[in-house]
Regions:
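N-terminal interaction modules that seed assembly of large macromolecular complexes
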Residues: 1-47
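Short Lys/Arg-rich basic patches
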Residues: 1-20, 56-92, 134-135
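Structural motif corresponding to the C-terminal cap of alpha-helices
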Residues: 92-96, 121
Length: 135
């Protein structure tokens, strides 16, 4: 499905960083939609255990190039699989509770998905503590 949106500068940097991590080539010929789909699938099994507030607070520490002023926001159309888009929509609803807000925009959800995937790839993903510890 094709979705039109404006991605923020940190999201654009995250896309570049994730591409570098996955393909070791920042000029790899893959679409932004494909990378968002890869990121979503990489964290899909952990969605309910991820500490989204911690990821949101750590955004500036996730990428090396965050302060690169040559990178600006991006108006783009993402081609996403239906399952990925459905997952993003479910996260939008979940994030309204997590961040105690009445409205949640897709670009913000996509940004957090990318940052969570980058943190997972670098073994720095913060998961919520298990509520039922069997000790």
């Amino acid at each position: 499905m094709r979705i039109q949106m404006r991605l923020s500068r940190p999201t654009v940097v995250a896309i570049q960083e994730y591409k570098q991590i996955k393909f070791a080539d920042p000029k790899a010929k893959v679409t932004n939609g494909y990378l968002v789909g890869m990121a979503y699938k990489a964290i899909q099994n952990d969605l309910d255990r991820i500490d989204w507030k911690a990821i949101n607070k750590d955004i500036s520490n996730v990428t090396i190039n965050y302060d690169d002023n040559s990178i600006s926001d991006l108006q783009t159309a993402l081609n996403l699989e239906k399952t990925v888009l459905d997952g993003i929509e479910k996260l939008q609803i979940k994030f309204m509770d997590v961040f105690d807000t009445k409205r949640m925009f897709r670009p913000f959800v996509i940004k957090l998905i990318l940052f969570a995937a980058i943190l997972k790839e670098t073994d720095n993903l913060t998961l919520l503590k298990e509520e039922n510890n069997n000790e």
